[in-house]
Structures are given as C-alpha cells and as structure tokens.
C-alpha cells in the first residue's frame, strides 16, 4: 500500500470499469514515469471530453453537438432504429458496416438489484420517438446477458402498443453473458443481418 497522492491515483484509477488493483497500479506508475507533456496532454483531453461532449438530443449517443452526426446524416434510414444499451454499442454496430438506420441509446439495462428500472433508462424517449417519427422497425440490440435479455423483454412488451411496428432482435451467434462491444465485426454483422421478429 502506497501513501499520499500515489495511492490516491491508484484508488481513482481502480474505480474505472475493467481496471483492477494491479492494472490501476501499473497505470499509475506509467503516468509517474511519463514525460510531463504527456501527462498534461492526457489531462487536457480528459477536460475537453468532460466539458465538450454531450449526449445527442435525439438518440442519446455521445456528440460534440446537440444532435450527433448519425442523426444528422440524411443518408441514414430514419424509419429503422437500433436500440442499444450504451454509446460504445453504437460503435460496435457501426464497425459491422451492415446497419444504415439510426440508433437509440438507453443509457444502460434493467437491473433491479442495482436500482435500475425503466425510469432510469431512456425508454420514455424511445416510445415518444416511435409515436412521433415514422419508424417502421425497431431492432433490439441489447447485450446477450441477464440484464440485456430482461431489457429486451420489457421493450417488446412496451412496443406491442404500436400497431404495424416491426420489432426484431439480433440473431443468435452472440455469446450469452457477453457484451456487444466485444463481439467481432463478422459475428455482429451476421447477427444484425439475421435478426428475428419478437
């Protein structure tokens, strides 16, 4: 156990998702050994992200402007919306180059044990979009884990209120319990192409 600012840095890094105590320690000592200009550049980038990145007014993806580039792109099909849990999942689907519609980012998944219910997600905004815009298909692309499946089931129930709306789910091929962001492009592309009605 270290003391003072070194331990504070290790503790803060350890709070980041996917960073355990050993990784936090490795990163902290890397930063201590780095050139001051490199540390300053990292600090500036973190500050810019915190001050300059917002969530898109329409879909909830990250953006430097009130409306993200995907929602502004007239070449995208506004009638097809892919629902994902997090902005990182938008990037995962985009890497497939299979999807030409738009997105809706929920901001998480249902997780009653952690206190995350429908009101903590952007479900209401999705329902408003479907009622307001001419959306004909909703592709549910939540993670293939317990929380993602619960979220998908809940969304399917809510979307039944929209007659004529085609609701589909990504096809199998994604490992149960996995995260969408870690799926390779080929697997995710095939899951998107082979989506099924729910």
From Swiss-Prot:
Protein name: Recombination protein RecR
PANTHER family recorded: RECOMBINATION PROTEIN RECR (PTHR30446:SF0)
Keyword DNA repair part of the UniProt annotation: yes
Species: Saccharopolyspora erythraea (strain ATCC 11635 / DSM 40517 / JCM 4748 / NBRC 13426 / NCIMB 8594 / NRRL 2338)
MF (Gene Ontology): DNA binding; zinc ion binding
Residue ranges constituting the Toprim domain according to the UniProt record: 79-175
Membership in a protein family: Belongs to the RecR family.
Function: May play a role in DNA repair. It seems to be involved in an RecBC-independent recombinational process of DNA repair. It may act with RecF and RecO.
A GO BP entry: DNA repair
C4-type zinc finger span: 56-71
Record keywords, A-Z: DNA damage, DNA recombination, DNA repair, Metal-binding, Zinc, Zinc-finger
Domain of life: Bacteria
């Amino acid at each position: 156990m270290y003391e003072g600012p070194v331990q504070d840095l290790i503790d803060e890094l350890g709070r980041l998702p996917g960073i355990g105590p050993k990784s936090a320690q490795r990163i902290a000592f890397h930063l201590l050994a780095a050139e001051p200009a490199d540390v300053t550049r990292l600090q500036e980038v973190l500050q810019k992200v915190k001050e300059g990145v917002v969530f898109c007014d329409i879909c909830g993806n990250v953006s430097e402007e009130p409306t993200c580039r995907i929602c502004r792109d007239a070449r995208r099909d506004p009638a097809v919306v892919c629902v994902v849990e997090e902005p990182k999942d938008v990037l995962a689907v985009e890497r497939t180059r299979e999807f030409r519609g738009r997105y809706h980012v929920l901001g998480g998944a249902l997780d009653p044990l952690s206190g995350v219910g429908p009101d903590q997600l952007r479900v209401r905004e999705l329902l408003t979009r479907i009622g307001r815009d001419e959306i004909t298909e909703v592709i549910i692309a939540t993670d293939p884990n317990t929380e993602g499946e619960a979220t998908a089931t809940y969304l399917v129930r809510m979307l039944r209120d929209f007659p004529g709306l085609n609701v589909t789910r990504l096809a199998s091929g994604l490992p149960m319990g996995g995260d969408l962001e870690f799926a390779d492009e080929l697997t995710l592309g095939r899951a998107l192409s082979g989506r099924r009605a729910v």
